[in-house]
Each structure stands twice: as C-alpha cells, then as structure tokens.
C-alpha cells in the first residue's frame, strides 16, 4: 500500500509540474508581439493603390511590404518618411519595392 501511495504522489507531482510548464510556455508565447496591433493591410493597400496605373502589381507589392512592416504610408503616393521600414525595402536591383 505504501508503494502505491508513493507512486501516486510522484505521478501527481509530475503531472502538476508538466501542467505548470505548459502554462508558462503558453504565457510566454502569448506575450510575443504584445501591444502590437495588426493593421488591415488589404484596406490600406487598396487605398494606396487606388490611382495606380498597374493596380494588381501595386497591390501585390504593397501587401508584401505591409505584412513585413505592419505599416502603409497615408495617401496614394509619397509620405514614405512616415513609415521608415516601408521606405527601406528594396528590390534586388536596388529600387524601392514598396509603392
């Protein structure tokens, strides 16, 4: 009976420790990016590319930049200084990628 009780106590302690570890890791994972609000890239890029002569190309580049930077400058052109990450992304050829 004593062996059964000892085994049961050890299993209970092991279960509690495992559960605690899972909760700690879940709490750490939920804090990653805490305070960062994701913007609506589709809506922002639709407005940004509304006057583009090549809207599909503009939307593809804008969405790519938005997902990477979580920022799209206001207006249909310019204003890159308001979103430094967006303004710093370039193509392999060295040209600005983001519209």
From Swiss-Prot:
Tissues and organs where the protein is expressed, per its UniProt entry: Expressed in siliques, dry seeds and vasculature of roots and rosette leaves.
Compartments in which it is found: Secreted
Keyword RNA-binding on entry: no
Span of the signal peptide: 1-26
One GO term (biological process): response to gibberellin
UniProt main location, coarse: secreted
Claim: Signal is one of the keywords in the record: yes
Pfam families xrefs: GASA
Residue ranges the record marks as coiled coil: none
PTM per Swiss-Prot/TrEMBL: Six disulfide bonds may be present.
Alphabetical UniProt keywords: Disulfide bond, Gibberellin signaling pathway, Secreted, Signal
Gene Ontology CC terms, in alphabetical order: extracellular region
InterPro entries tied to this protein: GASA
Domain of life: Eukaryota
PANTHER family: EXTENSIN, PROLINE-RICH PROTEIN (PTHR23201), GIBBERELLIN-REGULATED PROTEIN 2-RELATED (PTHR23201:SF18)
Function of the molecule: Gibberellin-regulated protein that may function in hormonal controlled steps of development such as seed germination, flowering and seed maturation.
Family: Belongs to the GASA family.
Name of the featured protein: Gibberellin-regulated protein 3
């Amino acid at each position: 009976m004593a062996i059964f009780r000892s085994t049961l106590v050890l299993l209970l302690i092991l279960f509690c420790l495992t559960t605690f570890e899972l909760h700690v890791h879940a709490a750490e994972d939920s804090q990653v990016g805490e305070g960062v609000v994701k913007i609506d890239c589709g809506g922002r890029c639709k407005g940004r590319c509304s006057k583009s002569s090549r809207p599909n190309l503009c939307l593809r580049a804008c969405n790519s930049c938005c997902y990477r930077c979580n920022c799209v400058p206001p207006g249909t052109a310019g204003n890159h200084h308001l979103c430094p990450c967006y303004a710093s992304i370039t193509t392999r050829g060295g040209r600005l990628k983001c519209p």
